[in-house]
């Protein structure tokens, strides 16, 4: 499928894309957290930020940014530390709010949807490893002798985004249902938020120690 556009072993790629999307990461966790705390609208706004951020990174990967990042350690480190700092900030903010006993009901009935989108976008964009990953993964399924490799890259990128959309939609809908239960279980909600905050701190530590 799509062989005429320079795509090799598309079905193998699709299976690989599904497994990759299923691996838990900060983007997935952020979407799930907001679907639980802010409902389906908050979840989809977070997902939208992730989609746009990933699309930008895929375009940069295709445009050659991956090579620049790999050959310029200082650039890689700048983006890496910015991403780690932002993850640490998000994790610390969640933990602080949880320990102080703050919750969405006490703050406001209306979540800050604009902030949710911006945080998701920044979270997605400040991951230099993503650009390197897209190139290393996509190149295995692109015929370098094809006349228009940009089309091949676009097909693979679109497929990955669609798989991600399906999975995040499942998480968002599940999170919205969980919200109805958690609202009556304050202690459970507190434990859940604490775990999410700690996971963000863990993601920050992992990103800070990555090498290009």
Swiss-Prot record:
Q: Which GO terms describe its cellular component?
A: plasma membrane
Q: Which Pfam families match?
A: LysE (PF01810)
Q: Which GO terms describe its molecular function?
A: antiporter activity; L-leucine transmembrane transporter activity
Signal peptide extent: none
Question: Where is this gene product found?
Answer: Cell inner membrane
Single GO BP term: L-leucine transport
* Protein's membrane topology: Multi-pass membrane protein
Catalytically driven reaction(s): L-leucine(in) + H(+)(out) = L-leucine(out) + H(+)(in)
Predominant localisation class: membrane
Q: Where do the TM regions start and end?
A: 12-32, 49-69, 71-91, 122-142, 153-173, 188-208
Instruction: Give the disulfide map.
Output: none
Keywords recorded for this protein, A-Z: Amino-acid transport, Antiport, Cell inner membrane, Cell membrane, Membrane, Transmembrane, Transmembrane helix, Transport
Q: Which NCBIfam families does the UniProt entry name for this protein?
A: PRK10958.1
PANTHER family from the UniProt entry? ARGININE EXPORTER PROTEIN ARGO, LEUCINE EFFLUX PROTEIN
Q: Provide the family line.
A: Belongs to the Rht family.
Q: What does this protein do?
A: Exporter of leucine.
Question: What is this protein's record name?
Answer: Leucine efflux protein
The gene that this protein is the product of is: leuE
């Amino acid at each position: 499928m799509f062989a005429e556009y320079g795509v090799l072993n598309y079905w193998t790629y699709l299976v690989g894309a599904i497994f990759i999307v299923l691996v838990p990461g900060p983007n997935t966790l952020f979407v799930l957290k907001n679907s639980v705390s802010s409902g389906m609208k908050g979840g989809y706004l977070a997902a939208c930020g992730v989609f746009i951020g990933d699309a930008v990174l895929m375009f940069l990967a295709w445009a050659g940014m991956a090579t620049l990042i790999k050959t310029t350690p200082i650039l890689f480190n700048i983006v890496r530390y910015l991403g780690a700092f932002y993850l640490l900030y998000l994790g610390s903010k969640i933990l602080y709010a949880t320990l102080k006993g703050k919750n969405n009901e006490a703050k406001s009935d209306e979540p800050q949807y604009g902030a949710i989108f911006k945080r998701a976008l920044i979270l997605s964009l400040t991951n230099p490893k993503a650009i390197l990953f897209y190139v290393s993964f996509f190149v295995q399924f692109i015929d370098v002798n094809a006349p228009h490799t940009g089309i091949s890259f676009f097909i693979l990128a679109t497929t990955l985004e669609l798989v991600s959309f399906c999975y995040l939609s499942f998480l968002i809908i599940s999170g919205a249902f969980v919200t109805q239960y958690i609202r009556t279980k304050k202690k459970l909600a507190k434990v859940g938020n604490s775990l999410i905050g700690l996971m963000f701190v863990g993601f920050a530590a992992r990103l800070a120690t990555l090498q290009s």
